[in-house]
Structure formats: C-alpha cells, structure tokens
Curated annotation (Swiss-Prot):
HAMAP family given in the database record: ATP_synth_gamma_bact
Highest taxon of the lineage: Bacteria
GO CC, any one term: plasma membrane
Pfam family, one: ATP-synt
Annotated Gene3D superfamilies: 3.40.1380.10, ATP synthase, gamma subunit, helix hairpin domain (1.10.287.80)
Entry keyword set: ATP synthesis, Cell inner membrane, Cell membrane, CF(1), Hydrogen ion transport, Ion transport, Membrane, Transport
Subcellular location, principal: membrane
Gene: atpG
Subunit structure: F-type ATPases have 2 components, CF(1) - the catalytic core - and CF(0) - the membrane proton channel. CF(1) has five subunits: alpha(3), beta(3), gamma(1), delta(1), epsilon(1). CF(0) has three main subunits: a, b and c.
A Gene Ontology BP annotation from the UniProt entry: proton motive force-driven plasma membrane ATP synthesis
Keyword presence, Ribonucleoprotein: no
Protein name: ATP synthase gamma chain
Keyword Ribosomal protein: no
Location of this chain's protein in the cell: Cell inner membrane
Length: 291
C-alpha cells in the first residue's frame, strides 16, 4: 500500500500533467480556428479549379496530343505513394490512421504485383512506415522548421514529384492525408494526382461552343502542374486542421482523465490518512487503558 507521501507526490504529479494538457488543448483550439479557416477557404478554389480542368480534360479526352500528366504513361506498374502526416505527435490517432491507410494500400499494390515507392511528408508517418517498408522509401520532406504551411511548400513538393515523373520513376502518384470534417471526425483519404483525375460531374456546363486560345492541350499542359501543387496544398491544409482538431480532442480527453485520476488518488489519500489517524487514536487509547 503506498504511503501518504507517495500518494501526495502522485497527486501533485498528475496535477502538473493536467496543467500541461489543458494548456496544449487551449493552444490547439487557437491553432484549429486558423487552420480550419484556411482549409475551408481553399475548398471553393479547389472545387472551381476541378470544374475548369474537368471541362478541359473532357474535351481533350485520351487523344494522342493529351498532356502526359493527363493521359498517363500507359501503365500503372510503378506506384508512388506520397504520405502526408504531422511532424509532432500527441494528436490521438491522426498520424496512425493515415499511416494505416497507406500501409494497406502498399500491401494491396504488392499483392497485385505492382512496384511501390514511398515519399513521406512529416516525420511521424515516416517513422511508422519506415519500420516495415524502409526499402521502398525514395524521399522525405521535412517541414519541422515551417511554422505555417504555405503554397510555396506545396510547390516544392510538387516540383520534386513532377521531376520524378518526367524522369520516368513512376507511373501513378497518390497522396494520403486526413480530410477535416470537425473536431472529432477526420477522414483518412487517398487521392490520385498523377495521372490527373477530375470529377466529370463537376465539369462546367456551357450553353455554347467554347473556342480555346491557345488549344485545350496547351492550356492543360500549363495548368496540370499547377493542379498537382494545388491538390497537395489542399491536402496539407486539410491535414493541418485535422491535426489540430485531433490534438485538441486528445488533450481534452487527457485533461478529463487526469481530473478523474486526481479524484481517485485524493479519495485514496484521505482514506489512508484517516486510517493512520484511527490507528494512532487506538494506540493512545490502548496506552491509556494499560496505565
């Protein structure tokens, strides 16, 4: 049975932990508001961009002049998985859920006889996947020093991926991230970015004949690389909001659990203290009777 001193030290330790988790919860809540606004503000642009690109892609189809980023290489043998997670932990199952989705994709592709390559963004995903698929890694993007992810960061990642595609290192590229819904719900998502896939239902409807100048192919050749960067940026923003939402929820749970533990330890401390006092009284009474 722990002594009164041990119980007192444990209560003090848990109280200090509760202060830390409460502070982290408040910081995450403040960051969440900014991250959520950024993610939600980017969605209309991404949807509009998809509509324009879907219309252009539909008019070009699979013609011989279609850009390679749209038509693809004609094969899906070599798959590049771009797994985007956080640089930090203490955010519940946020990182683990993305890594789990990517891991399952790797296993499915390998079972189908495909060659898999992995590029990670964020060290938490790298640490998890590298233990099992270290030989599949072709690169890692470190955003530790980036306080607030911007479009320039997405451009850097896109530039690396496009250079690898132009060099013939892979046929299909898919990004993995967590789509933000609310504080308690973040959905691990896989989205193919090369060859480009656009929602045909989102294509802009036109009432007349549209004549593009220059040609649709030339416009697509210019916009498709930007589309890759845009999709990566949108994924990073969704990840940012999801991470803060998951951290806020995790720290809230930790704070409440710490409070419950403090209550239990306090009850145990009071019972032990009462037992000590009772024993001392018994000893005093017994001594008095002996006299």
């Amino acid at each position: 049975m722990p002594s009164l001193k041990d119980l007192k030290n444990r209560i003090s330790s848990v109280k200090n932990t509760r202060k830390i988790t409460k502070a982290m919860q408040m910081v995450a809540a403040a960051k969440l508001r900014r991250a959520q606004e950024a993610a939600e503000d980017a969605r209309p642009y991404a949807e509009r961009f998809n509509a324009v690109m879907a219309g252009l892609a539909a008019s070009v189809g699979q013609s011989d002049t279609a850009p390679k980023l749209l038509a693809g290489t004609g094969s899906d043998q070599v798959q590049l998985l771009v797994v985007m997670t956080a640089e930090r932990g203490l955010c519940g199952g946020f990182n683990a859920n993305i890594a789990k989705l990517a891991r399952q994709k790797v296993l499915d592709l390998q079972a189908a006889g495909k060659t898999v390559k992995i590029l990670t963004v964020g060290k938490k995903g790298r640490d998890v996947l590298k233990r099992e698929f270290g030989d599949l890694f072709v690169g890692h993007v470190d955003l530790t020093e980036v306080k607030r992810v911007g479009y320039v960061d997405a451009q850097g990642i896109a530039k690396d991926i496009l250079a690898r595609f132009d060099a013939g290192e892979f046929d299909v590229a898919t990004i993995f991230y967590s789509k933000f819904q609310n504080v308690v719900t973040q959905i691990p998502t896989a989205q193919q970015i090369i060859p480009a896939e656009f929602d045909a239902e989102g294509a802009e409807a036109t009432s007349g004949v549209v004549d593009y100048e220059p040609s649709e192919e030339a416009i697509l050749a210019d916009l498709l690389p930007r589309g890759v960067a845009t999709q990566i940026f949108a994924g990073l923003l969704e990840n940012g909001a999801s991470e803060q939402g998951a951290r806020m929820s995790a720290m809230d749970n930790a704070t409440r659990n710490a409070g419950e533990m403090i209550d239990k330890l306090t009850i145990e401390y009071n019972r032990s203290r009462q037992a000590v006092i009772t024993n001392e009284l018994i000893e005093i009474i017994s001594g008095a009777e002996a006299l």
